Amino acid sequence: MEKKHIRPAASAFLLMVTMSLLSTALSFFVGPVCEDMGFGRGSFTLYYSLMVATGAFSVSFLGKYMNEKGVRNIILVSAVWCGVGFLGLSFCRALWMFYVVGAAMGFFGTSCVYLCANITVQQSYSARDASMVMGVVMAGSGIGGMVWSNVVPGIISSFGWQMSYRILGVCWFALAMLSWLILGKQDLSGAVGKAGAVASSGKGVFRTGKFFMVFSVACILTMASCISQQLPSLLGGMGYDAAQVGLMVSVMTAFVAVGTVLEGLCCGKFGVVGTMISVTVFYAVGYGMLFFPGMIYVALAGLAFGSGSLGTLLPIVVRHVFGGRDYAAVWSMIMTVTSITSFLATPVWGMVYDVCGNYNPALITMPVLLGISVVLLMTLFRKKT
């Protein structure tokens, strides 16, 4: 691969590492901040929910801008915006201050940065190459998460939570600016349209049957991925002790990192149709294997590969079905849908346990929904063909 072709991938990879500052590093501040300020953990973490909510709102508008103007301006804004946001968190002294700063950061935070990375890849590579590159790029969030998980607790212990927020602000600004510099002054706007099929432009695409099918598949995959928040509790209820649960969660995290790369490679080699359907079937099998203790690692692999497909394969499906012209608009809308679905579905998993005393109703329902998702994908790809 030529140097000029490596730059977009390297830039997108760095953006995913940057994104992990919000998705992973912030979780280590919950204990220190709540203990120091006397906040309840549930009340305090609401600021992160607000961050996610405003991010879901903003990407529905940013996608169209990125498709027309490219992503460099948005990366630059995010570098400054969230860098200052981290600084603002360090000066918060009341819950409402955290809520305001968190909500503001969300506009150019996690969802925005992920969208920038995604569109950079889709605009810079052919459909075949984009699938392989996206698998590697998605691993950046996992690698970044592992780094921050080992570094951030020590920083907080040494400097306190206020100074640590400022240090992370500098890290965010530096990484985002490095990504911006590596990307260079490339004219990415409209490039994806040259690589993909031409689709009908405008809001009419959101009223088509194929959009409804992609919308439904995205919702089902997101609902299925919400098991990750309940996984430690689920495994504990199956009789595993804390050490075993910790090991299994770590193994699943490793499966996700490996799975995203493998999915990208398989998509490039065998095509998006077979890969997406196969992974979704494996996802359903993973849920089924949770009822068989001897197959627990097969179950974890299925769950990991399935959840990884949201970020790796679903964007390729959108490009395959809608082509390049509508990609940014459709994908930003799908991101909004998945964010809202996650926001609504996550507490439902907990409610199932509260009402039934176990997760069995959800574990039985999800393979059925994933089966429906497979049927929708087959119909979608047949219509496309």
Model-derived regions, located:
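Extracytoplasmic gate region of multi-pass secondary transporters
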Residues: 26-30, 206-263
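Helix-to-loop junctions at the C-terminal end of transmembrane segments
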Residues: 58-70, 260-271, 353-354
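Intracellular juxtamembrane helix-capping segments at the cytosolic ends
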Residues: 111-125, 309-322
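Extracytoplasmic
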Residues: 7-41, 58-62, 149, 227-233, ...
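Interfacial helix-cap and linker-helix signal at transmembrane-aqueous boundaries
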Residues: 33-34, 65-66, 147-159, 164, ...
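Helix-loop-helix hairpin linking two adjacent transmembrane segments in secondary transporters
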Residues: 137-184
